[in-house]
Amino acid sequence: MTKRVLISVSDKAGIVEFAQELKKLGWEIISTGGTKVALDNAGVDTIAIDDVTGFPEMMDGRVKTLHPNIHGGLLARRDLDSHLEAVKDNKIELIDLVVVNLYPFKETILKPDVTYADAVENIDIGGPSMLRSAAKNHASVTVVVDPADYAVVLDELAANGETSYETRQRLAAKVFRHTAAYDALIAEYFTAQVGESKPEKLTLTYDLKQPMRYGENPQQDADFYQKALPTDYSIASAKQLNGKELSFNNIRDADAAIRIIRDFKDSPTVVALKHMNPCGIGQADDIETAWDYAYESDPVSIFGGIVVLNREVDAATAEKMHGVFLEIIIAPSYTDEALAILINKKKNLRILALPFNAQEASEVEAEYTGVVGGLLVQNQDVVKESPADWQVVTKRQPTETEATALEFAWKAIKYVKSNGIIVTNDHMTLGVGPGQTNRVASVRLAIDQAKDRLNGAVLASDAFFPFADNVEEIAKAGIKAIIQPGGSVRDQESIEAADKYGLTMVFTGVRHFRH
């Protein structure tokens, strides 16, 4: 019995060669629309879909394959006499291979000028139906959705006259993943169109970006996936100019770094980061000086860290960074001379370029946190704050220099793991106290790191002080200005302690926990 294949593809890469090889193996080819035209033009004989269905393609191609002569030929079980009798009684011919890929919905909605009507018209109906029918009946039918699988199918057909069950099952699984992702993308688009912020079903689709050697630790398996609708300002979209593949921990740290620097758009800034905590932030009138400040913040912790710069890297800055062991450098661009300096004798240094002009668009994405058996979803902590809305709660007002330093500290503290404390001046971090289970321990840690540079320093806390002992520690160290959210039932005790020691303290009214 002659074997039949149905081919209907939007991605025509390799399809002519695939069909030609099938013809050599004696296969009969059914095809539709543009695919049939492409095959006919290449000299591959095909049967029109309407010759199989007895109906013409209609409604601008919306209806062409949704017919019992197609789906009966796909779904009929070869091991059931009743199915084979139904096929015979209704003059349905069996289809043994389906090669289908879908309308380019993703590519359509990514176009800057796409209309809603264009998006709707690129929702494939017949294609997913054929794929699912063939995949359901994979015991007898081979289904191909990815041109990368043409070769393995041809090899097995040439060698054995049919594909193995294992191959058909693997290809069916791929189809169900593909159609699920396709529908998830459509659901995501429509959910956004109607402004639904809390859908009762959440479907997310990501594409494999990079299989990883291991995860956070060597005993953990891991992979890196990218959103099906890519975000330009993202480590997943970064252009790697040098170095080894990014590790699991590299990616998490790099992501934290590019989030931090979004808050420092106005001035040349360098952020150094280790284990998702900033270990140095420097801000200046030029990027070289900003690097100096970030490095001087903590010359020890920066070793083996990640650095992100929000201005082009020039040769002078590259020379300074070249002398420090770094895992990753991220910047919007690099001069040719700077790149040559950084790469010299450092083939493993990972150098990434990112479009910093796409930062704002990245801020609207939701954050997803996995828990056992569930998923937490929240907006990013990108609330717009204005110092004009802050409240000085002490008798003493901040000086102009202190006010500038407090603004800088408040931007920096947002990215320190809770309980988080940071000590800064108006252009660089001096001490970081991250992740302690009580706030006074974080205060002591940050002060101890900054102890030789406390003259004129200020301190920021990511959440309120539950007791006045924090203020006591700060005053004892000689720090004269504090910024914190406020909101404790004991705020007045902290205010009184600040007044007692002549400190100025600002309440922002906004908490910045980070777990």
UniProtKB/Swiss-Prot annotation:
Sample GO molecular function, one term: phosphoribosylaminoimidazolecarboxamide formyltransferase activity
Keywords: Hydrolase, Multifunctional enzyme, Purine biosynthesis, Transferase
One Pfam family matching this protein: AICARFT_IMPCHas
Record field: catalytic activity: (6R)-10-formyltetrahydrofolate + 5-amino-1-(5-phospho-beta-D-ribosyl)imidazole-4-carboxamide = 5-formamido-1-(5-phospho-D-ribosyl)imidazole-4-carboxamide + (6S)-5,6,7,8-tetrahydrofolate; IMP + H2O = 5-formamido-1-(5-phospho-D-ribosyl)imidazole-4-carboxamide
GO annotation, cellular component aspect: cytosol
Pathway info: Purine metabolism; IMP biosynthesis via de novo pathway; 5-formamido-1-(5-phospho-D-ribosyl)imidazole-4-carboxamide from 5-amino-1-(5-phospho-D-ribosyl)imidazole-4-carboxamide (10-formyl THF route): step 1/1; Purine metabolism; IMP biosynthesis via de novo pathway; IMP from 5-formamido-1-(5-phospho-D-ribosyl)imidazole-4-carboxamide: step 1/1
GO term, biological process aspect, one: 'de novo' IMP biosynthetic process
Matches recorded under InterPro entries: AICAR_Tfase_dup_dom_sf (IPR024051), Cytidine_deaminase-like (IPR016193), MGS-like_dom (IPR011607), MGS-like_dom_sf (IPR036914), PurH-like (IPR002695)
EC number(s) per entry: 2.1.2.3, 3.5.4.10
Domain MGS-like: 1-145
PROSITE patterns noted in UniProt: MGS
Keyword Hydrolase: yes
Organism superkingdom: Bacteria
Matching SMART domains: AICARFT_IMPCHas, MGS
CDD domains documented for this protein: IMPCH
NCBIfam families registered for this protein in UniProt: PRK00881.1, purH
Similarity annotation: Belongs to the PurH family.
PANTHER family: BIFUNCTIONAL PURINE BIOSYNTHESIS PROTEIN ATIC, BIFUNCTIONAL PURINE BIOSYNTHESIS PROTEIN PURH
Record remark: domains: The IMP cyclohydrolase activity resides in the N-terminal region.
Name of the protein: Bifunctional purine biosynthesis protein PurH
Species lineage: Bacteria, Bacillati, Bacillota, Bacilli, Lactobacillales
